[in-house]
C-alpha cells in the first residue's frame, strides 16, 4: 500500500472496547487496543494516502452470540439494552466494512464506526 500511496485498512473492534463488560476485561482491553491502534496508525499512514478505520459491532447474530440468544432470559436482557430492539446481522457489519474500503469514504480515517443498534448511545 505504501508503494502505491493509496489504500484502506479496516480493523474489527467491538462496542465492548468502548464501554467494558463484566467478566470480560481481557476482551474489552483487546478491543480498546484496536481502537487506539486504528487512530495512531491512521495518523501515521495518512501522508501516504492510506486510510485506517475500524468497525465496532455490538451484538450480532453469530456463533459468538449463540449461547446468549439460546438463553431466553439473557437474550431479553440484552435486547432491553439495545434501543433498536434486535441484534445486528453480519451483512450489516459487512456493508460498513465495504463502505470503509471504498472510495466513498475517501476522506474518512482514524474513525471507529460503532454499529450497535444504539447500545452505546445511552
What are these regions (language model features)?
Residues 1-8:
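A short helix-coil junction within the Rossmann-fold of NAD(P)-dependent oxidoreductases
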Residues 10, 52-55, 65, 110, ...:
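Hydrophobic structural elements of the Rossmann-like NAD(P)H-binding subdomain
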Residues 14:
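Residue(s) in the substrate-gating loop at a strand-loop-helix junction
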Residues 18, 56-67:
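Short, flexible catalytic-loop segment of classical short-chain dehydrogenase/reductase
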Residues 18-24, 29, 46-47:
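Active-site "substrate specificity/gating" loop of NAD(P)-dependent dehydrogenases
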Residues 30, 38:
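Active-site helix of classical SDR
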Residues 43-47, 106:
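Alpha-helical segment proximal to the catalytic Tyr-Lys
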Residues 54, 73-104, 108, 117:
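C-terminal helical subdomain
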Amino acid at each position: 500500500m505504501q508503494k502505491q500511496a493509496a489504500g484502506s485498512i479496516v480493523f474489527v473492534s467491538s462496542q465492548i472496547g468502548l464501554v467494558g463488560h463484566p467478566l470480560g476485561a481481557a476482551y474489552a482491553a483487546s478491543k480498546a487496543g484496536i481502537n487506539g491502534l486504528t487512530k495512531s496508525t491512521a495518523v501515521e499512514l495518512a501522508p501516504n494516502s492510506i486510510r485506517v478505520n475500524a468497525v465496532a459491532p455490538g451484538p450480532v447474530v453469530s456463533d459468538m452470540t449463540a449461547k446468549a440468544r439460546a438463553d431466553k432470559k439473557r437474550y431479553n436482557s440484552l435486547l432491553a439494552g439495545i434501543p433498536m430492539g434486535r441484534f445486528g446481522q453480519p451483512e450489516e457489519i459487512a456493508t460498513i466494512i465495504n463502505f470503509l474500503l471504498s472510495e466513498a469514504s475517501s476522506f474518512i480515517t482514524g474513525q471507529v464506526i460503532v454499529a450497535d443498534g444504539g447500545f452505546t448511545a445511552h
